[in-house]
UniProtKB/Swiss-Prot annotation:
Residues 439-474 form a coiled coil. This is Protein LTV1 homolog. Keywords: Coiled coil. Transmembrane segments: none annotated. The keyword Coiled coil applies. One of its GO terms (biological process) is ribosomal small subunit biogenesis. Residues 28-37, 453-462 have a biased composition (Basic and acidic residues). The lineage of its organism: Eukaryota, Amoebozoa, Evosea, Eumycetozoa, Dictyostelia. The keyword Coiled coil applies.
């Protein structure tokens, strides 16, 4: 083998890649420089290709595409407005912008690794950058402003299309073959293509009968084939009425076969419909079980029930006036009408009124003929409790408490266990005299006794009032505890 030009020991691998084509302002420069850098040291020569193989794999179209991209990128103009956020539409946005000055320009960072290499982060970039010049940004905007009238003019064709006249004659009616006219073709030139599409469509229908799109089966001859007329080409673009007339004339006797087929379909549908109706007429619905008869019953056993129902029905269906009269007899609070008042005033009250008495009432009166002794003998000792007859005492209420006197025993402090009767206390209250008022011809000793007695009475009242408060508090605590117990017992559920 010949000795290689470069030995493996001394060779150095280089890799080429495209550098970033954005400047420090983030604008596209349109220039892509090839940068050469050192490759990896551990690179092995297994993937080396000869020059002929590379040339075979590289297509000429790729080279042309690369050249086209380079040319287009060179033609691109630098759009300063896009970097600021405005459209390049010919409008002078600098009129409405405030000039910038005295600030610090922070450059756009396109590579994050570049920011990581900085120790102080973005602060270091701001220090190294230049301050923003006065009127920065406005010059770039005003530079792209189109001041020439020629550049802003609209084409005459667009103006004519936008102009709309009020006259109806100005609107042109489109022909049926306006698509062909727009493409610059004629019917004669496209007739072959139309025939091919028709034949393809007919073949598709023959293979797939389920996708037959023609109404009423006008082209079907009954033998599984579709016929094509002789003059289909001439009549294809004529009016619809003439087209359908020709098809009906060409069908001929094939309509009989179609009628027979339709009759068979109608009979099948009717049979299916009758079967569905029979299913709905069945009384067995779902999974319900049929009713079972438990046996026969005599109607005479229910005569009392029927009679009661008839009586209630007659009572509830009486005339309205009769119902009102019965209500007024039973209820004295219902007001009378003026007519009823006039009838009552005109009535002769001295006249005797005969009242008919039914046999049923006489039967009830016979039961009342029993003596008191015989009736008392019918009662047992459980119901009959003999005792002395006494006059019932009237219940007297206390003025202080409002409770009945003699029902609740009360004890007073200072007594030796012998409580006075409530009636005596009430009598003493009635006999009590106002001790706070001085009397005529009162001596000093009597006055002193009166004041001492008044003090004792007030002291006793204060003690009673205090005892009453304590009793109420105890009862309140007791009732609250009872209510809590009831709530807890009601909320607890026990399962066995």
């Amino acid at each position: 083998m010949p000795k290689p030009f470069i030995q493996n020991k001394n060779k150095q691998v280089l890799a080429t890649f495209t550098a970033s084509y954005r400047d420090r302002h983030g604008r596209e420069t349109g220039v892509r420089d090839k940068v050469i850098s050192e490759g990896e040291e551990d690179y092995s020569g297994e993937d080396n290709f000869s020059g002929e193989e590379e040339y075979e794999e590289y297509d000429s179209d790729d080279s042309e595409h690369d050249e086209y991209i380079q040319q287009e990128s060179a033609k691109k103009e630098v759009d300063d407005l896009s970097t600021i956020g405005f459209k390049k539409d010919g409008f002078d946005y600098s009129k409405y912008m405030r000039p910038i000055g005295g600030g610090v320009f922070i450059p756009a960072i396109w590579d994050v690794n570049e920011l990581k290499n900085k120790k102080n982060g973005i602060v270091e970039l701001v220090k190294n950058s230049e301050p923003a010049p006065f009127m920065f940004g406005l010059e770039e905007i005003s530079k792209d402003y189109k001041k020439d009238v020629k550049d802003l003019e609209v084409d005459e064709d667009i103006k004519e299309a936008l102009v709309v006249d009020d006259e109806e004659d100005d609107f042109e009616e489109l022909d049926d073959d306006f698509i062909l006219q727009a493409n610059g073709g004629t019917l004669d030139g496209l007739q072959d293509e139309v025939d091919e599409t028709i034949n393809k469509f007919n073949n598709f229908r023959i293979k797939n009968k389920a996708y037959d799109f023609i109404d009423d089966e006008e082209d079907y001859n009954g033998d599984g084939e579709y016929y094509e007329g002789e003059d289909d080409d001439d009549d294809y673009y004529e009016d619809d009425e003439e087209y359908y007339k020709n098809l009906k004339n060409k069908s001929g006797n094939n309509n009989n076969n179609k009628d027979d087929g339709r009759k068979v379909q109608d009979e099948v549908l009717e049979a299916q419909f009758e079967i569905a109706l029979e299913q709905y007429e069945d009384e067995d619905i779902g999974e319900l079980e049929p009713e079972e008869t438990l046996g026969t019953c005599n109607v005479n056993n229910f005569e009392d029930v029927f009679d009661e129902f008839i009586d209630d029905y007659n009572k509830n269906h009486e005339p309205l006036m009769v119902q009102i009269q019965t209500l007024k007899k039973n209820n004295n609070f219902i007001a009378l009408t003026e007519k009823e008042k006039e009838i009552i005033l005109k009535r002769d009250w001295n006249k005797e009124v005969l009242v008919e008495v039914s046999d049923h009432e006489n039967e009830e009166n016979e039961d009342d003929k029993w003596d008191c002794e015989t009736i008392l003998t019918t009662y047992t000792n459980l119901e009959n409790h003999p005792k002395l007859l006494r006059e019932e005492k009237k219940i007297k209420l206390s003025r202080k408490t409002g409770m009945p006197i003699g029902v609740i025993p009360t004890k007073q402090k200072g007594d030796d266990g012998n409580s006075d009767n409530e009636e005596e206390d009430e009598e003493e209250d009635e006999k009590s005299v106002n001790l706070g008022v001085s009397r005529k011809n009162e001596t000093k000793e009597s006055k002193k006794l009166r004041k001492q007695q008044l003090k004792d009475d007030r002291k006793n009242k204060r003690e009673l009032k205090k005892d009453l408060k304590v009793a109420f508090k105890k009862e309140e605590i007791k009732q609250t505890s009872i209510i809590k117990d009831q709530k807890t017992n009601s909320s607890v559920a026990v399962r066995y």
